[in-house]
């Protein structure tokens, strides 16, 4: 019976395989095999014995079911694993788990899961960056209303809005690449991090194992990998989830009936918005992913708590981390994928954007007129007061600001009717938006090559 929504509703199959019970088991077998391989490289284990261990260190031979049977008696998962391996290896079983402690296996296997997760997350993020770059380029010069405090501000372009998202995504990619060597790490220095059980060659043994597995080698550990590494990983997941939810929240707001400037694609032939309101076209994918992003961020708190281990370690982190790392990873991937889907199928209504600007009766061009007055020789504060008074008069009378400006002595004396008309064209007050879009797109595309 499926219980967790990840089982039947959210997350991709690849992530579920990484963090599944079988995925964990498979990687722990791989770590145990790598340990014996390293001993073989250092002359402590024969080629023949290693060959036998390598042969049985696969889930089809040392099955998860057999390990579970033994664990029911031992009440210790890694001891059950090593017993099952030794059972299958016969005389070669003597060298299995030699010099290791349980968390050498557990944390190194988790390191493999994190490494594999990062590969998938990076792939999804690069796809999202590509989709967003295309959107920014397409809408580079689409003029729309900028809003601050939920109120009409001054014109921007939709391309600039998207470029802001795009550059943030690029920073997230940089953060991931910078942090991966600190996250994809194992450890193999035994019960308290001294390497005493491995002897004088302990550090070389650890180096051989971890480089063989494709993981980074830490300098100093206790019985476990430092949980600051997991904090950094889950913090990155949470950060990316924030980026995605911010985008999706904007889509949801722009799709409001009274704004209607952009929104999710909708299959009018098959899709249903409401069981009773037949006209509805709801931004359900954005809402869905926004909810999942909040769950991702919620895993920050237990991840921080899991770093507070006693002395060289305790076990209070173990049960919690079975949830935090797996669920945060899978859900973040889902959020990124859904955000890419929303932006791929996003509709943008440029005419509606211009209509919404026009609905403000020219008020959003007050800044433009003020700046032109300053350029004409009137002080900034005086220019501001002139436009403030004109704006409030226009609001009070329900007039167009351009009409009030035309009869305001200081403005009428400074500009002709044609010059004033040009000032009230929103496209003439978008600054260097196009340049910013172009550079953001170029940098983003270079980052994902």
Feature names for model-found ranges:
Residues 124, 150, 154-164, 168, ...:
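Short, contiguous, pocket-lining structural segments
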Residues 226-263, 270-329:
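A conserved active-site cap/scaffold subdomain adjacent to cofactor or substrate pockets
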Residues 102, 199, 216-224, 354, ...:
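A structural signal for small-residue-enriched, beta-sheet-centric alpha/beta enzyme cores
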Residues 366-414:
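C-terminal hydrophobic structural anchor segments
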């Amino acid at each position: 019976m499926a219980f967790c929504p990840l089982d039947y509703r959210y997350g991709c199959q690849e992530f579920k395989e990484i963090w599944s019970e079988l995925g964990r088991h498979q990687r722990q077998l791989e770590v145990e095999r790598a340990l014996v391989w390293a001993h073989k490289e250092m002359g402590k284990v024969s080629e023949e014995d290693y060959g036998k261990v390598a042969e049985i260190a696969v889930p089809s031979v040392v099955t998860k079911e057999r390990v579970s049977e033994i664990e029911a008696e031992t009440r210790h998962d890694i001891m059950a694993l090593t017993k099952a391996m030794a059972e299958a290896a016969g005389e070669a079983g003597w060298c299995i788990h030699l010099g290791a402690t349980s968390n050498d296996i557990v944390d190194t296997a988790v390191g493999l899961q994190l490494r594999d997760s990062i590969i998938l997350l990076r792939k999804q993020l690069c796809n999202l960056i590509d989709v967003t770059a295309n959107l920014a380029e397409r809408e580079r010069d689409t003029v729309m209303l900028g809003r601050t405090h939920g109120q009409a501000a001054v014109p921007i372009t939709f391309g600039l809005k998207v470029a802001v998202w795009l550059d943030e995504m690029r920073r997230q990619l940089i953060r991931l690449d910078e942090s991966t060597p600190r996250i994809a790490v194992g450890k193999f220095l035994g019960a308290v991090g001294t390497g005493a059980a491995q002897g004088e060659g302990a550090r070389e043994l650890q180096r051989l194992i971890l480089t063989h597995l494709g993981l980074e080698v830490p300098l100093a550990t206790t019985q476990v990998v430092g949980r600051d590494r997991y904090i950094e990983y889950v913090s990155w997941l949470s950060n990316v989830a924030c980026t995605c939810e911010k985008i999706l929240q904007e889509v949801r707001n722009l799709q409001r009936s009274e704004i209607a400037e952009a929104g999710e694609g909708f299959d009018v032939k098959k899709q249903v918005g409401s069981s009773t309101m037949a006209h509805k076209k709801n931004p359900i994918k954005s809402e869905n992913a926004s909810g999942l992003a909040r769950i991702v961020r919620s895993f920050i708190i237990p991840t921080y708590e899991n770093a507070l281990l006693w002395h060289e370690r305790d076990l209070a982190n173990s049960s919690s981390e079975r949830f935090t790392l797996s669920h945060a990873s899978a859900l973040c991937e889902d959020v990124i994928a859904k955000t890419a889907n929303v932006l791929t199928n996003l509709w943008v209504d440029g005419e509606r954007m211009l209509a919404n600007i026009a609905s403000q009766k020219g008020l959003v061009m007050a800044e433009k007129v003020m700046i032109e007055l300053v350029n004409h020789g009137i002080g900034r504060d005086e220019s501001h007061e002139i436009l403030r008074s004109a704006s409030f008069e226009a609001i009070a009378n329900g007039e167009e600001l351009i009409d009030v400006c035309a009869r305001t002595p200081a403005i009428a004396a400074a500009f002709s009717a044609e010059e004033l008309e040009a000032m009230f064209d929103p496209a003439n007050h978008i600054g260097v938006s196009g340049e910013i879009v172009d550079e953001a797109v170029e940098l983003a595309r270079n980052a994902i090559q």
